C-alpha cells in the first residue's frame, strides 16, 4: 500500500496570487520531504468550515493569509506566545493528539530577512509605519533584538497608542502622530499596503538617518513606491517584503517538518520567478 503523502495548504481570499505553493514545493525538494502544498480559496466568512474540512480530511498543516488570520486565531485550540501577542495566526499545525496549534511566523520572517541583509537591530532606532495586524505581528520579535527604541506611527493615532501600550512591557515602545514624526531613525519599516496602490504614507522624509535602512513589507518586480521614495530621501539600503515572505514560510516549514530549509537560495528562485512574470 502506498503511504499517504502529507498535505499542506494556504488559505486566503483571493489566493491566486500566492507564492506559498512555489516556496513550499522548493523547500520540500531542498529537504527531501514528500508532501503536497496547494492554494485554497475559502469563502469570506467560511474559513473555519474550510479549515475543519481540511484537517478532517487528513491535512497536516496550513498557512493562513488575508483575510483569515483572525479567524485562524479563533480556530486554533492552542496558541504559541507569539501568536497570542500578534492577535493573529498565519500557521496551523495538527498535533498527534488531534489539537490544532496556531502560530504566527511573520515577525520571525522579518527579523531573519533583516539579519540576512546584515541590518543591525541591536541598539537601532526603529520606526514602524502602520498599526494594523502586519505591524502587531512583528513588534515583539523586533524588541527581542534589543533596539534602543521602537516608535509606532499611524494615520489613526489611537491605534498606534494601543499597540505601544500593549507591547511596552517588552521594551522601549512609543507611539507618535504621523504629522509630528520628524527625528531620524536607523530602520524604517512600512507595514501598510500603500505601495500596492502607488501611494505613500503621510510621513516626513526627514526620518531617514545616514546609512538608514528602509523596509517595505509589500513587494513587486522592482522597487516599491515606498522604497523608491526612501532612496530619494537618504535611505542607504532598501528592501522589500519578499525575503520576509520566504522567512515566515521557512519558519512554518520548521514547525511542520522539524527541518529548517535554506531561505537564501529559494529567495533567489522566487525573485527570478517574479521578475520573469
Swiss-Prot record:
It catalyses: shikimate + NADP(+) = 3-dehydroshikimate + NADPH + H(+). Shikimate binds at residues 18-20, 65, 90, 106, 219. It is an enzyme of class 1 (oxidoreductase). Keywords: Amino-acid biosynthesis, Aromatic amino acid biosynthesis, NADP, Oxidoreductase. InterPro entries: Aminoacid_DH-like_N_sf, NAD(P)-bd_dom_sf, SDH_C, Shikimate_DH, Shikimate_DH-bd_N, Shikimate_DH_fam, Shikm_DH/Glu-tRNA_Rdtase. CDD domains: NAD_bind_Shikimate_DH. It comes from the Bacteria. GO terms for molecular function: NADP binding; shikimate 3-dehydrogenase (NADP+) activity. One of its GO terms (cellular component) is cytosol. The active site is at residue 69. Its EC number is 1.1.1.25. One of its GO terms (biological process) is shikimate metabolic process. The keyword Aminoacyl-tRNA synthetase does not apply. NADP(+) binds at residues 81, 130-134, 154-159, 217, 241. The keyword Amino-acid biosynthesis applies. Pathway: Metabolic intermediate biosynthesis; chorismate biosynthesis; chorismate from D-erythrose 4-phosphate and phosphoenolpyruvate: step 4/7. Homodimer. Involved in the biosynthesis of the chorismate, which leads to the biosynthesis of aromatic amino acids. Catalyzes the reversible NADPH linked reduction of 3-dehydroshikimate (DHSA) to yield shikimate (SA). Belongs to the shikimate dehydrogenase family. This is Shikimate dehydrogenase (NADP(+)). The gene is aroE.
